[in-house]
Amino acid sequence: MITDQNSKPQQGELPTTHIDALTNSFSQFLRIEATSGAVLLLATVVALTLSNSPWSDGFRSLWETPIGIQIGAFQFLRSLRDLINDGLMTLFFFIVALEIKREVVLGELRNPRMVALSVVAAAGGMLVPMGLYLALQHGQPGQHGWGVVMPTDTAFVIGCLALLGSRVPPGLRVFLLSLAVVDDLAAILVVAVGYSRSIDWTALALGAVGLVIIRGMALLGVRNIRVYFLAGAIIWLAVNASGIHATIVGVILGLMTPTAGWVSDQRLGEILRKVLSYPPGDHWSGDTEDNRALQVAGIAVRETLSPVERLEAMLHPWVAFGVMPLFALANAGVPITIKGLINPVSLAVMAGFVLGKPIGVTAFAWLGVRTGVAIRPAGLTWGGLVGGALLTGIGFTMALFIAGQAFQDATLNAAKLGILAASVVSSVAGLTLLCALPRSDGTPMFRGRRGGGEHP
């Protein structure tokens, strides 16, 4: 039996064991903002390396492996890549929707004046790249890929900001994260509306009935998360059969998730005071009433957190360090060739991200502030905003996802090369500018050492 007699917890903290030293360090590792982006980058490098190696054929065929089940007349068969893109990515979209709802109800997006700049800038960061892409691809086979250049990859942007650490003004961090939330919401709508197949209305109606049932369970007070996941899986199957991209199920369920806890803070305080009223010591009776009080306290502590907060804390590590790297491995692998890089689709994608994104974000943000629609956060200079706008050209995850819906074969490979090249150029350009900008005290955000070891 594990005991805590050798542990020395601080007052008000839980006792610890030897294994906690390892698990707590790992938890801290997962909480580092840059880690998710670093793991995603590593998966991308692995995919690109294997796709341009002697093992490329085997690597590509791995993701085409058919996987499925058959029960009587019912058969569900998909390739491994499709299961990741359509199935596991539903969890990614679910997390995105949870973050959007949390920010709208509880976070930075509550204040219309604070969020106006991000909304206006995000609109420019989607419309200008899309317009530039369509101008270059009008009447061409790649015209259907207009949605590829709209999104911003939150994980990579956060990773870039984390590299700069405390040198990043808080206003810039809030601005970019809010902008990425708006971008994600728009990208979700693009996938649902712009890249769905012909619709089977019967299957779609079954999915809608499932959503009504989930809403009814919530109103009745059903709190077992497993029941909701089972219902969500059934709804996913129905929507997948309808022709609408099934990842939209994750979005809808995320937006339906309550933001209020079942147990109020006042009720929690009353329950904990009852437990604390027992005299301290080793004479805990262990009778049914005492055990019941502890069980109620445990449930109350858990249920004080809203379902949005609990689900985000539970699923986010799995999505960030499992689903997204798998997605990168399955989709980022593409043969790197000069012919692919100079393909008109690749060049249009690069132009949309590298030029369209920063121009659109900066111009619309300036117009928003100039017209009084939005205000610039304290500490966020125009130079910092331009540096952040350059980082929004990192499309990656959502861009690869939309490209997979819009293109096939050679055109898809060209779009992927454009996305990867644009992400590299945008990250280097954004970081370089942000490092060169002065702090509020007039010193550069980044300074290197001179040969003599003295600082300028």
Curated annotation (Swiss-Prot):
GO terms for biological process: regulation of pH. The keyword Cell wall biogenesis/degradation does not apply. The chain crosses the membrane at residues 32-52, 87-107, 114-134, 145-165, 174-194, 202-222, 233-253, 318-338, 347-367, 382-402, 417-437. One of its GO terms (cellular component) is plasma membrane. It catalyses: Na(+)(in) + 2 H(+)(out) = Na(+)(out) + 2 H(+)(in). Keywords: Antiport, Cell inner membrane, Cell membrane, Ion transport, Membrane, Plasmid, Sodium, Sodium transport, Transmembrane, Transmembrane helix, Transport. This is Na(+)/H(+) antiporter NhaA 3.
